[in-house]
Design a protein with these regions (language model features):
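Active-site core of glycosidic bond-cleaving carbohydrate-active enzymes
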Residues: 1-231
């Protein structure tokens, strides 16, 4: 995002997304490999760890925001749809159940724990993918797709909240990265959002920074949104 803000990287990202789409053809299910351009076959499941493959929705959203790119959704839609269908195919009770590293490289260094407890982080990326594709389908006039992904977005979002978010605002047993991802991607309702923000701020005050590779970029903006300028 910072690079795109400071430099004209639009053509670079269009080309990179074409490489991403080509890499999906290297495996049987359309997963996105762990590198783009792909270095060998993308593999199934583990080599498409969530957070990496979700660039298929995150980068187009950035291009729209920074460059007012009107063509990117049409260009990337087949690739995005292929990946989202892979995600849905690996769901149980509307949540992802395959391996992932979670919010790795956090200061506590416990990568095994992060991998074993990757669910709230991984599934927040899926909620965002579904949100992006339902909007893209609507913009592109793909009504059947829009209805399908609208339903799945609502089901996965509700399943996430039910599984990891308690009524008092504690998220995933007070896991800092889960607070961040919930506030970033889950579009929490007003009262619940306020409670989650309060627990999130309390967690940061007690523990300092405990987010990893995925959560850290959102930490300060979310603290600012919660009115915690001094804590930032």
């Amino acid at each position: 995002l910072t690079g795109a803000y400071n430099y004209d990287t639009q053509a670079f990202w269009h080309n990179w997304l074409r490489d991403l789409a080509l890499g999906q053809k290297d495996n049987s299910e359309g997963y996105i490999g762990s590198t783009v351009p792909a270095q060998g076959k993308g593999g199934i499941g583990f080599l498409s760890m969530l957070g990496w493959g979700n660039a298929v929705s995150i980068i187009p959203t950035m291009l729209e925001r920074i460059f007012d790119d009107k063509e990117i959704l049409k260009e990337i839609y087949p690739s995005l749809k292929t990946f989202v269908e892979c995600e849905i195919g690996r769901m149980k009770d509307d949540l992802w159940i395959s391996p992932s590293l979670g919010d790795w490289l956090s200061p506590n260094g416990n990568m095994a724990w992060q991998a074993m407890n990757n669910g709230p982080v991984s599934n927040s990326f899926i909620v965002n993918d579904l949100n992006v594709i339902r909007r893209a389908a609507s913009i592109l006039g793909l009504e059947e797709d829009h209805l399908r992904y609208e339903r799945q977005y609502n089901k996965t979002r509700e399943a996430w909240i039910k599984k990891w978010c308690s009524p008092d605002g504690i998220v995933a047993s007070d896991y800092q990265s889960a607070y961040v991802m919930a506030l970033k991607y889950l579009d929490l309702d007003g009262d619940l959002k306020k409670k989650v923000q309060e627990k999130f701020v309390d967690n940061v005050r007690r523990n300092g920074l405990r987010t990893g590779f995925f959560g850290t970029e959102h930490l300060l903006p979310l603290l600012m949104e919660a009115g915690e300028k001094k804590l930032c």
